[in-house]
A protein has these predicted regions:
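Flavin-dependent oxidoreductase catalytic cores
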Residues: 1-174
Length: 174
């Protein structure tokens, strides 16, 4: 089931819906939801493969996709095919320190048609603890043909400036 109540709020107030973030364990539902968000005015669709909340991951949503890059690819590809607006992806470095697959994930996202990837520079197991590993984001920038957005630890004005100098396409705070 899809809940579009927030999208309806925008329609009712006359505000425009810039981007809609979506996640789920059913690939067809993600694609159909993206299509509906576009119909309601979303100019960007953001698929969240970065959520590490245990009850979300246990249902096969969010960061659970990092364990199956083929499934992640299919979800991105079907969503790209379903909409005419840009599709971006939010993800993490990998499952844990022994399973960092961010470079593979980015390649799969590129191949599937994503227009950008936002990387939370921690693993699923880390959740929001410890330090973000910006080195992996720098590696991603070096190998990616699409913009990479650093997503974490933007605590002051100096961080985004340093990030930009490193070639990262942007920075966002959680």
């Amino acid at each position: 089931m899809l809940d579009f109540s927030d999208a309806q709020i925008y329609a009712d107030t006359g505000l425009s819906l810039l981007a809609a973030q979506i996640y789920g364990n059913d690939i067809d539902l993600i694609a159909n939801g993206a299509r509906e968000f576009e119909r309601r005015g979303a100019q960007i669709v953001d698929i969240n493969f970065g959520c590490s909340v245990p009850r979300i991951v246990e249902k096969g949503c969010g960061a659970a996709y990092l364990r199956d890059p083929d499934r992640l690819y299919t979800a991105v590809q079907r969503t790209v095919e379903a909409v005419s607006v840009p599709v971006i992806v939010k993800t993490r470095l990998g499952w844990d320190d022994s399973d960092i697959n961010i470079l593979e994930v980015i390649k799969r996202c590129e191949d599937a048609g994503a227009k950008a990837v936002a990387i939370h520079a921690r693993t699923v197991v880390q959740k929001y603890k410890g330090h973000a590993n910006w080195d992996w984001i720098a590696r991603a920038v070096e190998t990616s043909s699409i913009p990479i957005i650093g997503n974490v630890d933007v605590l002051d004005a100096a961080r985004p400036q340093a990030v930009h100098q490193g070639g990262i396409g942007g920075a966002e705070s959680m």
